[in-house]
């Protein structure tokens, strides 16, 4: 007797930090630098064979710009969807001041719960979703997936266009598959700040 194979209803999430950016008076959220565009184009080539069902982006311009480059290059059939949940809200200050103040900040736990409810939920079919957002948010999500102290994200680093893969199994388990993969980037394309 043959058993009936159940359909795969796993959700595969690909979290990506936006490309390198710079701020200006015209774009306080930041726009991609030439290097940031190269990082996004290289990432697009790296993931071109994924059967993506959706591309999500933070409402901040640098994340939208990164997501649009990826969509335009290899996924023109997908419209980039935006979510305010993916915004980098916890640390709006300049980087140097942020580094000095790290010990005073806490990850936004209530927002992590809303993100988990939205993206870690079970699917009625196999789904592959790209989520272009921010390093702080990705690190906080990883701590939640691992069940570690929410403030352990302060000891992690996320590179521009680093790829973090999370699998949400149909039985409710969530697993970290890779964190901050930049192995596809040439050394001269790797950046953090």
Give, region by region, the residue ranges found by the protein language model.
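Acidic, low-complexity terminal tails and accessory targeting/binding regions
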Residues: 1-11, 76, 81, 91-103, ...
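Active-site-proximal alpha-helix that buttresses catalytic centers in soluble enzyme cores
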Residues: 4-82, 105
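GST superfamily/GST-like fold recognition
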Residues: 135-139, 175
